[in-house]
A protein has these predicted regions:
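Residues at secondary-structure transition points
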Residues: 43-48, 52, 88-91
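RNase H-like nuclease fold core
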Residues: 1-48, 59-63, 67
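RNase H catalytic domain
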Residues: 11-15, 55-127, 131
Length: 132
């Protein structure tokens, strides 16, 4: 059993404003095997950008056939929503959350973990690249 790790992040300049998202997947030896930086939009919130980062990472993990995944992000809100500790109240986040839940069901073992920003540097770098 190989456990892969997905780090995700999002950023918004203005909140709402111009936003980018990033995600990176590491193999069980913590070697980067995939990464993505995406432009989210010109009127997006930070939380929408964070969910976008999560979704692009989850979609890729499913596409790669990953069965054991540790998901780490520095957004306490999103991690707690995915762990069902917080309800999703925002109408704009609800469809993103529901898609993330459905994608998570396609992975045999998935764990969501909050990490501090300093442990999420690569995904943060990618989310800022998504702004360009």
């Amino acid at each position: 059993m190989n456990t892969y790790t997905l780090y995700f992040d999002g950023c918004s300049k203005g909140n709402p404003g111009r936003a980018g998202a990033g995600a990176v997947i590491y193999d069980s030896a913590m070697i980067e095997i995939w990464s993505s930086a995406e432009f989210v939009g010109t009127n997006s919130t930070n939380n929408e950008a964070e969910y976008t980062g999560l979704l692009i990472g989850l979609r890729k993990a499913v596409e790669m056939g990953i069965t054991h995944l540790l998901v780490r992000g520095d957004s306490q809100l999103i991690v707690r929503q995915m762990n069902k500790e917080y309800k999703v109240k925002s109408a704009s986040l609800k469809p993103m959350y529901l898609e993330a839940v459905e994608l998570s069901k396609l992975i045999d073992q998935i764990t969501y973990q909050h990490v501090y920003r300093e442990y999420n540097k690569r995904a943060d770098e990618l989310s800022n690249l998504g702004l360009v």
